[in-house]
Swiss-Prot record:
Keywords: Ribonucleoprotein, Ribosomal protein. This is Large ribosomal subunit protein bL12. The gene is rplL. One of its GO terms (biological process) is translation. It comes from Synechococcus sp. (strain JA-2-3B'a(2-13)) (Cyanobacteria bacterium Yellowstone B-Prime). One of its GO terms (molecular function) is structural constituent of ribosome.
Length: 136
C-alpha cells in the first residue's frame, strides 16, 4: 500500500494529458540526469499509456500538431552493425553493451519524445550508417 503522499502524486499523474506527461519525462531526465530510453522499453511507455487512457475521460482538447517524435531503429544489416552501433552510442550516450542490445533488438526506439528537427537529424545519421529508420 503506497503512502498518502505517493498515492496523491499517483492521482495527479493519472490526470496528466499526453503532452504534459511528455513534458514531465523531459523535466525528470534533465533534473536527475537520467534517460527514459531504456533498452527494455517496457516501463518507459507505462506512464504515457496511463495518461492516454485517462485523457479521453477529460474534456476534448483541440487537435494540436505533433511536437514530440520517436525515432525507431527498424532494421540493421549485418554488415553495417558496427557503424550503426557507433552512431547509436554517439546519439544516446549508452554504453557498449546497452547500445549493442538496442541495435540487436531492432525494431526499437533509439530516442523518444524529441523535436522534429532532432528526429530528422538522428534519422539521417542512422541511415548514413546503413540502418532503416522510421519516425513516429
Amino acid at each position: 500500500m503506497p503512502s498518502e503522499r505517493v498515492a496523491k502524486i499517483l492521482e495527479e499523474l493519472k490526470a496528466l494529458s499526453l503532452l504534459e506527461a511528455s513534458e514531465l519525462v523531459k523535466a525528470i531526465e534533465e533534473t536527475f540526469g537520467v534517460s527514459a530510453a531504456a533498452p527494455a522499453g517496457g516501463m518507459v511507455m507505462a506512464a504515457p499509456v496511463a495518461a492516454a487512457a485517462a485523457a479521453p475521460a477529460a474534456a476534448p482538447e483541440p487537435v494540436e500538431e505533433q511536437t514530440a517524435f520517436d525515432v525507431i531503429l527498424e532494421a540493421v544489416p549485418a554488415d553495417k552493425k558496427i557503424a550503426i552501433l557507433k552512431v547509436v552510442r554517439e546519439l544516446t550516450g549508452l554504453g557498449l553493451k546497452d547500445a549493442k542490445d538496442l541495435v540487436e533488438a531492432a525494431p526499437k526506439p533509439v530516442k523518444e519524445g524529441v523535436a522534429k528537427e532532432e528526429a530528422n537529424d538522428i534519422k539521417k545519421k542512422l541511415e548514413e550508417a546503413g540502418a532503416t529508420v522510421k519516425i513516429k
